[in-house]
Amino acid sequence: MAGPVLYQDRAMKQITFAPRNHLLTNTNTWTPDSQWLVFDVRPSGASFTGETIERVNIHTGEVEVIYRASQGAHVGVVTVHPKSEKYVFIHGPENPDETWHYDFHHRRGVIVEGGKMSNLDAMDITAPYTPGVLRGGSHVHVFSPNGERVSFTYNDHVMHELDPALDLRNVGVAAPFGPVNVQKQHPREYSGSHWCVLVSKTTPTPQPGSDEINRAYEEGWVGNHALAFIGDTLSPKGEKVPELFIVELPQDEAGWKAAGDAPLSGTETTLPAPPRGVVQRRLTFTHHRAYPGLVNVPRHWVRCNPQGTQIAFLMRDDNGIVQLWLISPQGGEPRQLTHNKTDIQSAFNWHPSGEWLGFVLDNRIACAHAQSGEVEYLTEHHANSPSADAVVFSPDGQWLAWMEGGQLWITETDR
């Protein structure tokens, strides 16, 4: 069993220095040329008060403002298109007031390209609702590997108004079959550039021991036509157990626009429903384990390798240690990849070769080999503990970025 035994001395390089916070999203934080890191300036991940989306050149330290919010709105959680300098991020409401301000169900995705901003997802909260349009808040927007679609997590204004307990988190996708135009019968409604639907299905009261879930979250692309995500099941005893699910997506525009048994845009008493034939499938069955379920701490997003053959996630081993595990998108038994003596402390990402995964271990930046599980430390002697939120490889694989003490840092990977 491989343990972390290797260490090669590499220089850690601090990239930002301004006396403010710099926040990386958990993936896709580099421009396609591997020259710039994109970030937001929220004081912490728990507050949504940043006014700018910015980028820093890793070689020169030059900082550029990509977008500045106005009218009292705030922005954050930016990711980058894999092939062009196109940025997608969360935008809070303009002119917020007591009745309508930033919340899980009051936020949208926007895309900035060439300095121009456009709404990704439209919103229509006046019945009858509009197909291709959602009713609330989208969050953590990530382009598919080919850049054609955007995944996100979602909360619903209509259900929140009915009963907050019915506003269950779900996973959605923005597909390039817009624009979608809203008649704007409410001052807070807006149109969007993409056709948006939910692709997960939740219920407020899952049957204990079943595959039903009351929350779908922390999704990751599996190739360009499937998404894996964490779904909260109930054990036979009624305890929450987060399990891994996968959903295959429609292949063409007609598939994205075809409703199933329930309306794509929902009703006054039900959430929006997935397109016809889009049905989530459970991949892990961990109720019997000593430490059931994927872990929620550290918060992590499930991530598939670039080849589309292995989905990685974090789960405790039989000793209670948080380790990396791999499973095929087709299912089967998960394979424990790492055998560390201490918990993996952060979200993780794949090296673009698919041969390594990067994360925080023992308050250092580390890589695990995707076949052997052997762990190599890339850094040591951190003045502050690296943040658990993001460890992200550059597209060329040469750099690994993280946050530490409110600043952005990189190190060479030699990979």
From Swiss-Prot:
Q: Which domain of life is it from?
A: Bacteria
Under the heading SUPFAM superfamilies, the entry gives: DPP6 N-terminal domain-like
GO annotations under biological process?
galacturonate catabolic process
Tell me the organism. Escherichia coli (strain K12)
Q: What gene name is listed for this protein?
A: yidR
Task: Kindly give the Pfam families that the UniProt entry links to this protein.
Answer: DUF3748, PD40
InterPro entries referenced in this protein's UniProt entry, alphabetically: 6-blade_b-propeller_TolB-like, DUF3748, PD40
| Name of the molecule in the record | Uncharacterized protein YidR
